[in-house]
Amino acid sequence: MAANKYAGTQTEKNLQEAFAGESQARNKYTYFASVAKKEGYEQMSALFLKTADNEKEHAKMWFKELAGISNTKENLAAAAEGENYEWTDMYESFAKTAEEEGFHELAAKFRAVGEIEKHHEERYRALLKNIETAQVFEKSEVKVWECRNCGHIVVGTKAPEVCPVCNHPQSYFEVREENY
């Protein structure tokens, strides 16, 4: 990732706070939109969502200033590191504190979410390995590939360069999973 030119400054702290605040606002407004929609307030729901989208863009602007966005390979590595911290340190620490304070059900939730974060880390590391070994769109074994745009199916070791049905690029193909 690019160097953070604000490292060690109050401005860096301000950018981090701005990023956190905008990110939290985005999520809150998304949740508020769901409530408004359930209560029959479609316009209010839409306005919460519109504002949430604005907040997302504000957060992105500050995160870019912090040099937090890079290429996919580096983004996957950073995401895996973040998920690792969450499941190995953060949620376990939160669970211990909750237990000490008598909040046993909350402690169990913290640990359960920690397990989910562990799976997120594993997923990101597997995807990173696919990039590092050039196994994103080509596998050593025959796979069923599906175009995420039109649903076209291809059986083989490699996704086509272009979907023969909708002409979308190879990047739209994924290994098909049927878990139903």
Spans of features found by a protein language model:
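Non-heme di-metal
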Residues: 1-180
